[in-house]
Amino acid sequence: MALYTPANPLRTRRTRADTLAETFENREQSAYLKSAVERNINMAANPERRYTLEEYLELDRTSEERLEFWNGEVFCTSGVSDEHDAIEGNIYAFLRSQIMGRGCRVFLANMRIKVPSAPPYRYADLSVLCGKAEFEKIGGVNALTNPQLIVEVLSPSTEAYDRGEKFSHYKSIPTLREYLLVAQHRPHVTRLYKQDDGTWIHTEANELTATLTLDSLGCDLPLVEIYQGVSFDAPATN
C-alpha cells in the first residue's frame, strides 16, 4: 500500500472550495467569510499560499464544511457518497446499541479530535470512548482528547491518506487503542489494534459473514451490520 503523499490528496480535496464558496454566497455570509473562501480557492490555484493557524481556526469555526489544517494548508473533508453515509450510519447505530448503558459514547463526523502530532485537530467519521469524555478548548471550540476507537470510511480520494499519514498522526493520541478502515465499494474492513507494548497489529475482514472483535469496547461488530442496505454493484466515486 502506497503511503500518503501530502500534495496529492490535499489538492484533490481543495477542489471543493468552489462548492464551499457557493454555499457561503447563497446564504449571504459575511464579507469576511467570503474573503476567507476566496483565499481557499486561491490556495488551490497557488499551492504556495499558506494560512496561519488563527486564519484556519476562524474559517473552520464558521464553515458548514469540515476543514482540516496541515502545514499551512487547508483542505475539505466533507462531500461523501450515499454509500459512505449509509455505512457511517450503520456503524453508529450498531455500536451505540452495543455500548448503551455502559458509560460509552459514539461521536459522529462533526466531532473535532485533538491530535498531538498534527495540531490543532482532525475530523474522523466516527469516534468512540468509554468513560468520561475529555475536551480541550482550541480556538474557541471543543476538541475531544481521549477517543479509544476511531473509524474512517474510505473513499478513493482519501484512502491513501487515511491509511498512511492520518493514521500516523492518530497514533499520537495516547488513549487510542483501535482504528477501523472501512471500504465502501466492497465488504472489507482493516482493523488496527494497539497492544500493551505500544505496537500495532492489524487484521482484515472481507466477507459479509465475518465479525470483528473490538477489544477497545468489549463488543463484536459483524460486517453484515456495517453494510446493511449497501449495494456493491458499482464502485463508489467519492
Functional labels for PLM-detected ranges:
Residues 5-10, 21:
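Ser/Thr/Pro/Gly-rich low-complexity, intrinsically disordered segments
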Residues 19, 23-238:
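Gly/Pro/Ser/Thr-rich low-complexity, intrinsically disordered segments predominantly at protein N-termini
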